[in-house]
Amino acid sequence: MARDPSHLPRACRPPAIPVRVAEAALEISRTAIEEQLKICGHKKDADVFELFLSQKELTEVIDLSRFKKLKYLWLHHNKLHGITFLTRNYCLAELYLNNNAIFDIEGLHYLPSLHILLLHHNELINLDATVKELKGMLNLKTLTLYQNPLCQYNLYRLYIIYHLPGVELLDRNQVTEKERRSMITLFNHKKAHIVQSIAFRGKVDASWDPRSPFKQKPAQRVPSDFAFANNVDKTMFDDPEDAVFVRSMKRSAMAITSLNWDTVPTREEKYLEEKDTGPAQMLTITLR
């Protein structure tokens, strides 16, 4: 059963579809599916492994649970608003839903075998609801969400990587180890504190507990003529603490300077004049 769209803002809700129109839309999808079965020569539902239903002007799709062995489904470049037709397609491995008008992806958690999911160019708004629906997909490796309203949130990419650690290719870009380390620091403060404590032999302030910058509102871009020192992307934050924290996370190296004791003669060396008594030197260590 599809989620009640009343939880969405009025301007973002999908338009109500009259019963007759919905029935007609389902009939159109049924006809398109039957045509595909004839083209491929399938006589039994058990023989269907793939369905190509893109660019059919579909607004609704009939229930596809009859195709138990369906593995590949193309539904891109249609006019779909939701996904309520994939409830028992447990073998589905690749699903192409890009270039539609999808507001809600409720129902995708029924697809445990899915490893490729394309959802770019849709109308997804709620990032938390989207992530919640995708969390159970342990086999998901490739995901696209770009050109959706939810992509406008700050740290959107790191948020997805944190909650979907199995994803290797996000929005056509490989997930890097640097991104994985960054998302741990930003969203898993306890684990980050343990990692730093091990790295610095327990010499880390136990009170360190930064706030999650993801709770802030979407960043606002200031006019191009607004300039201030050392500001690169000109992203404005509602809370100064968030700005300070995000800025600190962008530092790629840390330098530690101390006295090089190898250049300082001992008392005995001074007495025996075995070592040049020149000025002591400083030693700089850079950590990355």
Curated annotation (Swiss-Prot):
Domain of life (superkingdom): Eukaryota
The keyword Repeat is annotated on this UniProt entry: yes
Keyword annotations from UniProtKB, A to Z: Leucine-rich repeat, Repeat
Keyword Lyase belongs to the record: no
Extent of the LRR repeats: 47-68, 69-90, 91-112, 113-134
Coiled-coil boundaries: none
Gene3D superfamilies on file: Ribonuclease Inhibitor
UniProt domain LRRCT: residue ranges: 148-186
UniProt cross-references to Pfam families, sorted A to Z: LRR_9
SUPFAM superfamilies with a match to the protein in the record: L domain-like
PANTHER family per the UniProt record, alphabetical: LEUCINE-RICH REPEAT-CONTAINING PROTEIN 72
Annotated protein name in UniProt: Leucine-rich repeat-containing protein 72
Naturally occurring in which organism (per UniProt): Bos taurus (Bovine)
